[in-house]
Design a protein with these regions (language model features):
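Conserved SAM-binding loop
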Residues: 69-70
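Conserved glycine-rich SAM-binding loop
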Residues: 40
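Conserved Class I SAM-dependent methyltransferase catalytic core
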Residues: 103-174
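Conserved SAM-binding motif I beta-strand of class I
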Residues: 55-60
Length: 278
């Protein structure tokens, strides 16, 4: 990821038009739980689930975006998804548009798309639906896990200019029943997605595929990490910080009064001394 992408925490929001196209493939008959582990300001999840009776929940690392999502009525946890816990097989719809980046370590760095999928796929109930928005090469990176845990997998190309810019595709999958999980059937086909991007169908309202979302109760996300913003605010108000400021931060002294000699005469004197020295 480029530095500009890292500065915005890998945030590449899905265009609203594409979220509405995704919505056209989803069918629900009763209220259900939907989770977005990288919810941003909440727009994508709201548009994807509009008028379906979904109970929305999400996680967002950026404080401002988390507040924006919460203001839209989404149950939002401010923090890292890796420090959040959700009971296994809790939600019927997992909408996942993770950061497009790699781990920053000395060796064996995984793609973030795979890390997020590994952490979150267990939240989906049997026959629940995964909506996975990623760059096309990431489908190959996640192929074995996807094929082992999901069936009825379909991949579509996105056509919005911003989506084309990042080679984005959307993958739909249905969580396998427990006794069918483990065998990565169809992984080879997913591995080839990155090499045949132009052959994929474009996601539009005309696509005939439909994914039925089973009912479920509202999901609960538990944050197990530290409240970093609250800690930072408390630190600024602490006695220790006030004492440290007195030692580390020097007060600037203001100098007032008239110069000893008028400025233009000082200049003349300096020039004269330089001439005499030469």
């Amino acid at each position: 990821m480029r530095n500009a992408g890292r500065r915005k925490l890998g945030y590449y929001p899905l265009p609203v038009s594409e979220a509405r196209n995704i919505r056209s493939l989803l069918v629900s008959s009763a209220p259900y739980a939907a989770i977005d582990p990288c919810i941003g300001d909440g727009t994508a999840l709201i548009e994807t689930t509009r008028n379906t009776g979904a109970h929305l929940a999400g996680i967002e690392l950026d404080a401002e975006r988390a507040a924006a999502a919460a203001s839209k009525g989404i149950s939002t946890v401010h923090g890292s998804a890796s420090e959040c816990r959700v009971l296994a097989e809790t939600c019927s719809l997992l909408y996942l548009n993770p950061p497009y980046d790699s781990e920053a370590g000395p060796h064996s760095n995984k793609r973030m798309e795979l890390i997020f999928l590994e952490h979150c796929y267990r939240w989906v109930i049997s026959e629940g639906v995964l909506v996975f928005v990623v760059p096309a090469p990431a489908v190959g990176t996640c192929a074995r896990l996807l094929a082992a845990q999901f069936d009825r997998i379909s991949v579509f190309r996105l056509q919005h200019p911003e989506s084309v810019r990042f080679n984005q595709v959307v993958l739909f999958g249905r969580r396998k029943k427990a006794y069918l999980r483990g065998e990565p059937k169809g992984a080879e086909e997913l591995l080839r997605i990155a090499y045949k991007l132009q052959l994929l169908l474009v996601l539009t309202h005309e696509v005939s595929d439909r994914y039925a979302i089973p009912p479920s109760s509202p999901a609960t996300i538990t944050y197990a990490g530290l409240p970093l913003d609250a800690i930072e605010d408390a630190l600024q108000r602490s006695v220790a910080m006030q004492n440290a400021r007195g030692i580390l931060v020097r007060n600037q002294q203001k100098m007032t009064g008239r110069p000893v000699t008028p400025l233009h005469k000082g200049h003349v004197g300096t020039i004269r001394d330089l001439v005499n020295c030469s």
